[in-house]
Amino acid sequence: MRKGTVKEVLAKIKYDPRENENDYYLIIEHRGDYGNVKKIPVNLIELGHGYFFVGETQIPYHRILKVVRKDGRVIWESRKIRK
């Protein structure tokens, strides 16, 4: 698992030419409902300061539970899950 904040991990995936953003997706807590999760491909997001965007929808970084590679390897995981 990579170290750093989720924003740092996503920036590396999106902007490092050695990475392919199509190989990753996010698992987010959808609408704050515990257990209601949504999968979002990283290539569909734009990074912001305290939020990321999917189209015009603004989602706070703290709702990201995991960053996962297509092969199922978890790259980053929220402390909420690690407890």
Curated annotation (Swiss-Prot):
It holds the Pfam family MJ1316. It comes from the Archaea. InterPro entries: MJ1316, UPF0248. Belongs to the UPF0248 family. NCBIfam families: PRK04257.1. This is UPF0248 protein PH1212.1. It comes from Pyrococcus horikoshii (strain ATCC 700860 / DSM 12428 / JCM 9974 / NBRC 100139 / OT-3).
